[in-house]
């Protein structure tokens, strides 16, 4: 049985491939666009059966000429995840139409389809639950994800021929994101800031939040891969699910966890947030005017639906997850 993973050389896709490998599954077709060649490194430690360029894959899907038999599932992680990309034509073709074509093909062939949605569909809301009235995206990226989720809702009412699951990823961090540049996680950037400068920067006060007190639901990519595989194991489950920890933690906590993990590797003692700020190991910069009115100061996944689907594993909190990530970066990137 063959499994297809799109975006396989990317951040979440490569972690799904790795998680499948850990189960002994290697009959994997990795689909991606390697025009940014450094992404190949994410697949170099994985075992796959074949690589297919994204554009060729899309052509074969649209013409119904994919040569693979007995496809067990499609994990669709390939998308433009740059929330600052305002090219609506590109975003809608790459994130919406491509996903719609894949859905139609998977439904025709009765293949389970697990795809990446996003918490960006909620915009600046303060309640993050999988309900239409709570969804108000702020940018074309969020809209592209929102629009496809509406397609799934309609298809579910009409009746599905095979499993379809959309995961609304919250703030994901972890190994294999180094190719993402400015779109990499805050933990990634803090690690490199600290290694280069000996301190990290955080946004100052804004929107009623104090220095570094804006909060996010930070979720480890290890947990994201686990949840994807849980639904792969349960093809009877379909729907849209938030994928976060259910906890909202301050950027201050993330910065402190990153700096302290780096300090621990240097043989230095852990410091409190107050001490880190006093010693200027954490510094605050003015909140950018360009982000005012477009910035989520708070996110927290409501994971009630995920728990009701039977997923009982505990998620890493920021401290434990970031410690694991910093250890990986020190071993692989430093």
Curated annotation (Swiss-Prot):
Pathway terms, separated by semicolons: Nucleotide-sugar biosynthesis; ADP-L-glycero-beta-D-manno-heptose biosynthesis; ADP-L-glycero-beta-D-manno-heptose from D-glycero-beta-D-manno-heptose 7-phosphate: step 4/4
Record-level GO BP terms: ADP-L-glycero-beta-D-manno-heptose biosynthetic process; carbohydrate metabolic process
Keyword NADP annotated: yes
Reactions it catalyzes: ADP-D-glycero-beta-D-manno-heptose = ADP-L-glycero-beta-D-manno-heptose
Residues annotated to bind NADP(+): 11-12, 32-33, 39, 54, 77-81, 94, 145, 172, 180
Superkingdom of the source species: Bacteria
One Pfam family of this chain: Epimerase
UniProt-recorded name of the protein: ADP-L-glycero-D-manno-heptose-6-epimerase
Binding site for substrate: 171, 182, 189, 203-206, 216, 295
UniProt GO molecular function: ADP-glyceromanno-heptose 6-epimerase activity; NADP binding
Its biological purpose: Catalyzes the interconversion between ADP-D-glycero-beta-D-manno-heptose and ADP-L-glycero-beta-D-manno-heptose via an epimerization at carbon 6 of the heptose.
Cofactor note (record): Binds 1 NADP(+) per subunit.
Keywords: Carbohydrate metabolism, Isomerase, NADP
Subunit structure: Homopentamer.
Species this chain originates from: Neisseria meningitidis serogroup C (strain 053442)
EC category: isomerase
PANTHER family listed in its UniProt record: ADP-L-GLYCERO-D-MANNO-HEPTOSE-6-EPIMERASE, NUCLEOSIDE-DIPHOSPHATE-SUGAR EPIMERASE
Active site: 141 (proton acceptor), 180 (proton acceptor)
Annotated family: Belongs to the NAD(P)-dependent epimerase/dehydratase family. HldD subfamily.
E.C. code: 5.1.3.20
UniProt entry tagged with the keyword Isomerase: yes
Comment on protein domains: Contains a large N-terminal NADP-binding domain, and a smaller C-terminal substrate-binding domain.
HAMAP family the UniProt entry points to: Heptose_epimerase
Cofactor: NADP(+)
């Amino acid at each position: 049985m063959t499994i297809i993973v799109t975006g396989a050389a990317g951040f979440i896709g490569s972690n799904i491939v790795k998680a499948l490998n850990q189960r002994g599954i290697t009959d994997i077709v990795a689909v991606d666009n390697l025009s940014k060649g450094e992404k190949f490194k994410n697949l170099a430690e994985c075992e796959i059966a074949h690589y297919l360029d994204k554009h060729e894959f899309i052509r074969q899907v649209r013409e119904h000429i994919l040569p693979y038999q007995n496809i067990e599932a499609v994990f669709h992680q390939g998308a433009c995840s740059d929330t600052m990309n305002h090219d609506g034509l590109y975003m809608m073709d790459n994130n919406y139409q491509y996903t719609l074509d894949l859905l139609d093909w998977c439904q025709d062939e009765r293949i389970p389809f697990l795809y990446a949605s996003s918490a960006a569909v909620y915009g600046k809301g303060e309640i993050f639950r999988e309900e239409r009235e709570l969804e108000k995206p702020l940018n074309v990226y969020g809209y592209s994800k929102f629009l496809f989720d509406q397609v799934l809702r309609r298809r579910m009412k009409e009746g599905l021929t095979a499993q379809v699951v959309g995961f609304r990823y919250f703030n994901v961090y972890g190994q294999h994101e180094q190719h993402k540049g400015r779109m990499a996680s805050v933990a990634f950037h803090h690690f490199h800031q600290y290694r280069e400068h000996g301190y990290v920067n955080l946004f100052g006060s804004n929107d009623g939040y104090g220095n570094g007190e804006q909060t996010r639901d930070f979720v480890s990519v290890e947990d994201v891969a686990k949840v994807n595989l849980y639904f792969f194991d349960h093809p009877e489950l379909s729907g849209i699910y938030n994928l976060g920890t259910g906890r909202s933690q301050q950027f201050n906590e993330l910065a402190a966890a990153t700096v302290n993990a780096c300090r621990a590797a240097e043989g230095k003692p852990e410091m409190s947030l107050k001490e880190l700020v006093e010693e200027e190991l954490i510094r605050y910069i003015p909140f950018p005017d360009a982000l005012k009115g477009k910035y989520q100061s708070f996110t927290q996944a409501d994971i009630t639906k995920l728990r009701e689907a039977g997923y009982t594993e505990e998620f890493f909190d920021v401290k434990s997850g970031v410690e694991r990530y910093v250890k990986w970066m020190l071993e692989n990137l430093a």
